[in-house]
């Protein structure tokens, strides 16, 4: 059982991975709950009884770094470089890139003010950031984190809308694959919304496999 409580200026968010965990944490005014569980009909029924709404289904993603035969260097069409996570452009891009992502929209109905506070917290905690640059402008970023002993995880990534079709996202993800291989990782992992077909297609292009579905439920008080 995991209960993570995060306090923001205007509200408190509890992230829970067990449907029984909430009972040990009394509700307060301005408290939002986000529960993520393995996809199963019983879990869905139980959470609905508790007053939660189904918000999203996420999928685990993995790119094997030992089996792939793709030439990822040929997929990189933009300049990719390390960047200070505190660069203001990173926060700006993040704030404009997730209009409905349930990692950040923790209210049953999307709320830009609330999601903005959650996004700011996420960006503040980024550690190993790479940016995509076009004519001196940062047009996208990707944060790469250790994942277990042998893998890496794409913790957060976003690209300015007008550069997505131009290959900026592919360049960032291909660079992440090469970076993970240089670190000696066996797999590059991620977790995405099953409704995000653009990112799903991007991962598929890079040879990823999908599995481990998890359902996201939210409730507010």
Describe each region flagged by the PLM.
Residues 40-54, 170, 194-212:
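Conserved active-site alpha-helix within GNAT-family acetyltransferase domains
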Residues 3, 11-15, 74-113:
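Short amphipathic alpha-helix that is part of the acyltransferase structural core
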Residues 29-39, 180-192:
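Conserved GNAT acetyl-CoA-binding A-motif
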Residues 124, 130-132, 174, 181, ...:
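Catalytic cores of nucleotide-enabled group-transfer and carboxylate-activating enzymes in metabolic
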Residues 17-85, 217-219:
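Acyl-donor-binding surface of acyltransferase catalytic domains
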Residues 20-26, 156-159, 165-178, 182, ...:
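Conserved acetyl-CoA-binding loop-helix of GNAT-fold acetyltransferases
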Residues 102-135, 139-152, 156-159:
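A conserved beta-strand-loop-helix scaffold within acyl/acetyltransferase catalytic domains
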Residues 7-19, 150-161:
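Conserved acetyl-CoA binding element of GNAT-fold acetyltransferases
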């Amino acid at each position: 059982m995991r209960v993570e409580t995060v306090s923001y200026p205007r509200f408190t968010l509890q992230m829970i991975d067990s449907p029984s965990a909430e009972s040990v944490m009394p509700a307060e005014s301005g408290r939002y709950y986000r529960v993520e569980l393995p996809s199963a009909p019983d879990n869905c029924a139980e959470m609905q009884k508790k007053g939660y709404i189904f918000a999203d289904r996420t999928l685990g993603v993995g790119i094997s770094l030992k089996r792939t035969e793709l030439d990822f260097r040929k997929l990189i069409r933009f300049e990719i470089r390390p960047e200070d996570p505190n660069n203001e452009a990173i926060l700006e891009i993040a704030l404009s890139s997730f209009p409905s992502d349930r990692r950040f929209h923790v209210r049953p109905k999307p709320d830009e003010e609330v999601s903005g506070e959650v996004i700011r917290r996420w960006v503040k905690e980024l550690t190993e950031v790479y940016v995509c640059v076009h004519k001196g402008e940062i047009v996208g970023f990707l944060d790469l984190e250790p994942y277990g002993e042998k893998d890496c995880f794409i913790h957060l990534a976003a690209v300015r809308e007008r550069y997505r079709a131009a290959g900026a996202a592919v360049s960032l993800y291909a660079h992440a694959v090469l970076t993970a291989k240089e670190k000696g990782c066996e797999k590059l992992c991620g977790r995405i919304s099953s409704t995000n077909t653009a990112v799903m297609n991007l991962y598929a292009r890079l040879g990823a496999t999908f599995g481990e579905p998890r359902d996201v439920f939210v409730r507010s008080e």
